[in-house]
């Protein structure tokens, strides 16, 4: 019994066998391979994204060491940090034309002496040097 239904004709397309059921495993196998390949690509993409977030977390200031920042919090902190650095640079440029010492005094007026010493001892996080050339290579 041959069926002329659209389903039978579609599943039979390109198949040399008189029975469409014989073609089904080959089609499923091809579909499964494509799905596995797509899953592997997505897994690599997500691993790359997570690695990038881990790298960003290492260079963005964090208030506490008790918990890892979420991706959203990491992006928010990075944005705040970039804006603060940008503000500092624009203020420094503005004051450097008139009175550089005044700018320095403004920056350090609110810092106690012992805090200032601890800030001066702060070192760049491990692997920091690795990111700077990439960031400012333009």
Swiss-Prot record:
Residues 33-85 form the bHLH domain. The keyword DNA-binding applies. It comes from the Eukaryota. It holds the Pfam family HLH. It is found in: Nucleus; Perikaryon; Cell projection, Axon. One of its GO terms (molecular function) is transcription cis-regulatory region binding. GO terms for biological process: axon development; neural retina development; neuron fate commitment; positive regulation of retinal ganglion cell axon guidance; positive regulation of transcription by RNA polymerase II; regulation of transcription by RNA polymerase II; sensory organ development. GO terms for cellular component: axon; nucleus; perikaryon. SUPFAM superfamilies: HLH, helix-loop-helix DNA-binding domain. PROSITE patterns: BHLH (PS50888). Gene3D superfamilies: Helix-loop-helix DNA-binding domain. The keyword ATP-binding does not apply. InterPro entries: ATOH7_bHLH (IPR032663), bHLH_dom (IPR011598), bHLH_transcription_factors (IPR050359), HLH_DNA-bd_sf (IPR036638). Transmembrane segments: none annotated. Coiled coil: none annotated. Keywords: Cell projection, Developmental protein, Differentiation, DNA-binding, Neurogenesis, Nucleus, Transcription, Transcription regulation. Its main location: nucleus. Inhibited by Notch and ESR1. Transcription factor that binds to DNA at the consensus sequence 5'-CAG[GC]TG-3'. Positively regulates the determination of retinal ganglion cell fate and formation of the optic nerve and retino-hypothalamic tract. Required for retinal circadian rhythm photoentrainment. Plays a role in brainstem auditory signaling and binaural processing. Regulates the differentiation of olfactory receptor neurons. During retinal neurogenesis, activates the transcription of several genes such as brn3d, coe3, cbfa2t2, glis2, elrC and xgadd45-gamma. This is Transcription factor Atoh7-a. The lineage of its organism: Eukaryota, Metazoa, Chordata, Craniata, Vertebrata. The gene is atoh7-a.
């Amino acid at each position: 019994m041959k069926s002329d239904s659209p389903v039978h004709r579609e599943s039979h397309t390109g198949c040399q066998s008189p029975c469409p059921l014989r073609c089904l495993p080959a089609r499923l196998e091809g579909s499964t391979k494509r799905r596995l390949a797509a899953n592997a690509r997505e897994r690599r993409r997500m691993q790359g994204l997570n690695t990038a977030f881990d790298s960003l977390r290492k260079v963005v200031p964090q208030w506490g060491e008790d918990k890892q920042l979420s991706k959203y919090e990491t992006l928010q902190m990075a944005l705040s940090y970039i804006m603060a650095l940008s503000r500092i640079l624009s203020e420094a440029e503005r004051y450097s034309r008139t009175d550089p010492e005044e700018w320095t005094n403004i920056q350090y007026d609110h810092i106690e002496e012992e805090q200032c010493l601890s800030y001066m001892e702060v070192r760049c996080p491990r692997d920091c040097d690795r990111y700077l050339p990439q960031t400012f290579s333009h």
